[in-house]
Amino acid sequence: MYGKFIKDTAGYEINTFDLPASWEYIYENKDILLKVDQYGPVYAQANPPGDIMLFKREQHQKYSPWFINITTDRNESLANFLKPYNTVIKPENVKIEYLPECAKYSFQYDGMRLETEIFLPDKGAKIVYKFKITNIGTENKKLKINPQLVPYLNDAVIAPWDKYDWYLDTKCEKGEYITFSSELLSANAESSKRRCAYFVSETKDLTAHEISLEKYIGLGDMLHPDRKYTHEERIYAYPPVYALEYEWLLSPNEEKELTQVYALDNNDVTDYFDNEHYIGKKSERKVVFDKLFSKNRIQTGDTEFDYYANYWIPMQMNWVASLDRGWPTGMRGTRDSAQDYAALLYTDTSSCKNIILTMLECQRSDGWMPRQYAATGKNGKHDLRGHVDGGAFFVELMWKYLSHTRDFEILNEETEWLDSTNKNTVSEHLIRAVEYYIRDENIGEHGLCKIREGDWLDAVNRAGIEGRGESVTVSEQMVMGLKYLADILNHINYEGDIKKYLDFSEKLKSNINKYAFNDENFYNGCFNDNGLWIFSGRDPDGEKRIYGVPNYYAVISGTAASENYKYILRAAEELKCDKGYRLFYPPLGEKPIDKVGRIASGDVPPFMGENANVYNHGSQGFLARALSVMGEGDKLFEVLKWIMPYDQTKHPTKKTLTPPYAIVNCYQQLPGFEHRGLMCFLTGSVAMAMRGVYEWMLGIKPCLDGLEISPCIPENMDNIKVQTEYLNKAYSLEIKGRKVFVNNKELTETRTDMINGKKVYFLPI
């Protein structure tokens, strides 16, 4: 519907501008992130996700701040993305191609073919924008071409009373090229933080330009400006625009092209006006993605699944690493980073080290890690709400990083603390992260970890603010986390007491099973400050309410005994619906429950966000991981296909309204929006899909001393081939029946998985 996947790449072709929603695609090179949709550029951010926005659409704004208006000799207006002008226009041969290396837009109308191409080079905060018209008719075409870009050039979020334009000094210079430059001044008199953006365009056929947005718009608006051109050369403290006018005369079969570049660095900008240079840079960019797609390859016999896993999952992992959760506020979530980068390790280990060190300098000296930390590090703005799960996720990331890289030297590096200038080693930071959870003041009356202001489920944000509430999920995470720490310390010959961590892990496991496993044979979610269990066999509102996450983590962490797996499977089946697996059920809020949080207060409608929806990350990602432990290959494969968006029998586009290439945050059941997808790419589900394929289904798990391999595959898949990399070496795996071959040699050595006790194949490396 609306288009089709492009073979052999993470590409999609769209054949109409009239999509039911904004269908987005991301371009990023670490120096800049650009989001586009069918109507062109949406926003651009330097050094994502923590730096300034170069331009952005405001909320509910449909059309791009950077587009080109075309006026014909019949005084008819249209744009290079067709709209926002005459909506009666019916273009022909619409073709929007999202390719990893560039975005292409083309259509035909009134004897013209209009083409736009948007490109980010491999390095640098630059956006190259090329627009071409070809006269495919039989008569001359006399056209006015009016490009316009409204720059923003400021932090994504500023004070409500503040204005971005107060800090901009914009100039225009005309030479071989016309160059607009906007200098961002510092509101805090820090001259070192000044920035300058450059917008460069051609001068051939140029007839007018304008830098004052106010004067350019006149009595109109941004979509229909008066287009007054005063030819002023400077404006400051008022909003700028980069507006130009060209006059083109095209004979039949003649084409004309306009190149524009928007950049934070004026070096080599004009090189992109040379098409040979541009094509070369585009080819270089394509090679980068070809290498990305070749790092891990699977061949299962399910061609649609293989295509999506081989191209779209690694592509979106790259995006997520730069988007974080897509709120361009300059912060990253601790739990979000930990989960995303644990999956990114399969394709990009170097970025993970930088993230780890940044996270640790934002760690409090008692071991606690913030809900969100500044992407720029310790001295930035942080979200210091009292959620307690960040460190639990971080410990697993640290173990996985060491397993994927063997970079044990990182443990000796030193970094400061959020609340102290003292420096300690990474290993000390890691130990304190774990010991935070086992300190007496952070253990509740049932011997479980206290929940404070929240765990993974953000909307349970008032269950423990008085200091009594406990989290079952965090306790289960620490059953694992304590073992991860012990494994690391054993590996580096740590001379301190390691046994105490393993003992406490067993103690937590015992307490969870004693107090949180209820008479209905599933695990409760949390214990609140009122002394009541929530997500239990009988909640305070009278409902039996199964919450998947603590049940799945009971299996993942090795807390649940294997004889109780049948109860976890039954609980999951009770959460299943026609959209996948719900996070919990029934919804909260009809009868408000005190001391739980916003999700149970009546302020979050049923089936909104996490509230009893198919919340992809926790509903299906954690379930997939648990199913791999339980050896449920058929169910695991089905759940992975529920996470992914391409299968029209599971997530029909006519219902979700989101693109079939985009992994979403959740599928909602709100009245009038049944099965509607919410927030493309802004989710930990992408990381769950990556790990789901390679770590949980194919069972490839790097460890501190080698590879554990424990496939969990459907019964009908009897010959799977895998190409992967580990420690910069390529490995070829074949899974035939229940046998595993590595580089054509059958793997026979086994050992016990230290977390869940399963027997697994082992390849010492």
Where are these regions (language model features)?
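Non-catalytic C-terminal accessory modules of carbohydrate-active enzymes
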Residues: 42-55, 61-106, 112-114, 609-612, ...
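Catalytic cores of carbohydrate-active enzymes
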Residues: 146-148, 163, 370-371, 477-599, ...
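Extended, loop-rich substrate-binding clefts of extracytoplasmic carbohydrate-active enzymes
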Residues: 75-124, 219-244, 307-314
